[in-house]
UniProtKB/Swiss-Prot annotation:
Keywords, sorted A to Z: Lipid transport, Transport
Organism name: Dictyostelium discoideum (Social amoeba)
Region span, Disordered: 290-364
Biased composition (Basic and acidic residues): 316-352
Record-linked PANTHER family: GH16843P, PHOSPHATIDYLINOSITOL TRANSFER PROTEIN 3
GO MF annotations, alphabetized: phosphatidylinositol transfer activity
Record-linked PROSITE patterns: CRAL_TRIO
Pfam families: CRAL_TRIO, CRAL_TRIO_N
CRAL-TRIO domain boundaries: 113-281
Gene3D superfamilies from the UniProt entry: CRAL-TRIO lipid binding domain
Top-level taxon: Eukaryota
Function according to Swiss-Prot or TrEMBL: Has phosphatidylinositol transfer activity.
Protein's name in the database: Phosphatidylinositol transfer protein 3
Length: 364
């Protein structure tokens, strides 16, 4: 288990980022007529449109088919919004994402591969859509009881399910965000993996701007509020407006969430959450309908640290080494000066003694 200081430092880094970047900016509701294609440029002002044209032109040199497919018009706009339409910052953020995706190839992760054990547990999965047509990513922390699974694989499993959610977006209809539902029933300290959760937030900040449309936390326990108190003061109003806490009520001995039905149709809501959907996640059934991609070589082992965090740590380490070298240099210079001073003092003393001897000889 991580120390409190480590957790606090990680939370501070994340919340600092969240205060600088809004990953969940409010967008107006999308209303399309039948057969109408969503136009992402329709509501841009002149300055925003110029920024869009500039960043799109800057990426016109892309040759990798995967990069080209990733960089849609709506993708460019997500990264622009994440950096307040400052093209240089948006471009850097997007290029960092492309580099990360090229290195780790999240689209090639195989659920039946090295994440099968954690993937079978049902800690995270994708199922159905909310009332706005957004894919729903469910998280069930109580299912995370696998102590022998390293954080790297837990993080990789989360990235897999995020990619599954992204693949279900429908950009022609303006759908580019997901709905995140976390069921905290029976959640305990043994299910808390703060490291993976914090790194997941780093990942969302660095590589998934504007993707989270709504977060619904069901029956949050006392342990959750401990973590929330650390993070929430740093979140801006727009981000907080996308988060909602919903407590259940027992009806005929079953949990029900009346407020949850504001977001999800009862037909798309699982029975254990008060809906009509008879569904229990099963990895084999899921893979039948969503087979793993066929790849020559599997993606390399994930690190739970995103590139930006690594760069910060490396920079901090370099600065520390530099300060250490400067300190050693100053110490050496100080020792050299001290030695030089003692040498001068010695020479002066010897010169004085010699003079005294000469004076004594003259007297004799």
């Amino acid at each position: 288990m991580e120390s409190t200081a480590s957790t606090s430092d990680s939370a501070s880094a994340i919340t600092t980022g969240l205060s600088e970047v809004d990953i969940n900016q409010q967008s107006p509701p999308i209303i399309l007529k039948e057969g109408e294609i969503f136009d992402p440029l329709k509501n841009l002002n002149e300055k925003q449109l110029e920024a869009f044209k500039e960043i799109k032109s800057n990426f016109s040199d892309l040759t990798d088919p995967t990069d080209i497919a990733f960089c849609t018009d709506m993708c460019f706009l997500r990264y622009l919004r994440a950096r307040n339409y400052i093209v240089s910052k948006s471009e850097k953020m997007l290029r960092d994402t492309l580099e990360w995706r090229k290195k780790f190839r999240p689209q090639d992760i195989q659920l039946g591969g090295d994440i099968r054990e954690i993937g079978s547990a049902g800690c995270v999965y994708v199922n159905k859509r909310d009332k706005k047509g957004r894919p729903i990513i469910f998280a069930v922390p109580r299912n995370d009881t696998l102590k022998n699974v390293p954080s790297e694989l837990k993080f990789k499993n989360l990235v897999y399910w995020l990619e599954q959610g992204f693949s279900r977006m429908d950009e022609p209809k303006g759908i580019e965000q997901f709905c995140f539902i976390v069921d905290y029933k029976d959640f305990g300290s043994g299910n808390m993996d703060m490291k993976t959760n914090l790194e997941a937030m780093h990942f969302l900040l660095d590589h998934c701007p504007e993707r989270m449309g709504q977060s619904l936390f069901l029956d949050p326990p006392a342990l959750f509020w401990f973590a929330w108190k650390i993070i929430s003061p740093f979140l801006n109003e727009v981000t907080l407006s996308k988060v909602r806490f919903i407590n259940s009520k027992k009806v005929d001995g079953k949990r029900t969430f009346a407020e949850l039905l504001e977001y999800v149709d009862i037909e798309n809501l699982e029975q254990n959450l008060g809906g009509n959907l008879d569904y229990n996640y099963n990895i084999d059934e899921y893979l039948k309908e969503n087979p793993d991609p066929i790849v020559d070589t599997p993606p390399i082992t994930f690190s739970t640290e995103t590139d930006s965090k690594k760069q910060k740590k490396e920079k901090k380490k370099e600065e520390k080494e530099k300060k250490k070298e400067e300190k050693e240099k100053k110490k050496e210079e100080k020792e050299e000066k001290k030695k030089e001073k003692e040498e001068k003092k010695k020479l002066k003393k010897e010169a004085s003694f010699t003079k005294q001897q000469e004076n004594a000889d003259e007297v004799d």
